[in-house]
Amino acid sequence: LGGRLVLGGETGRGTVVELILPLTLAILPTLRTACAGRSLAVPLRQIIDLQTFDADQVQMRGDVPLWSGTQPAIPLHFLDQWLGAPKGLRKLLVRVSTRRGDCGLVVDAVEGREDIVVKPPGALLRGLPGYGGAAVTGDGRIAVILNPDELTTMAVEA
């Protein structure tokens, strides 16, 4: 399947076994968002809430932007930067739950909820962190499916 098995643990505390399976051809409930003119899909199962984004509530810890609108503050991912696009409108924050804790995805708009058929990433895109696949949406557009767990891993490794 192309997944991973991660083993870890601490002496006296136990062993952690993490089985990571890739998104395969499946129907996935998502929240479609827009960022820098592109359609992005966020898996609904990971969404905690939506908030209005206010740049005044961003604090920096080193190179990591944090959203202070929640307690504790959470790391932010500006998806226009992830896409390599010019700065977007940055109106909304999608707070998601990941294996490493909560984080915020900053987007321009919400397009709505949609169940989409996931197409696994092709060879060119397979190694891109944060990319979980693609889908043709109901209106015929291509939506990039985000993998919030990998986005959070990118921030921690940066």
Range-by-range predicted roles:
Residues 1-158:
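Glycine/threonine-rich ATP-lid/beta-loop region of ATP-binding domains
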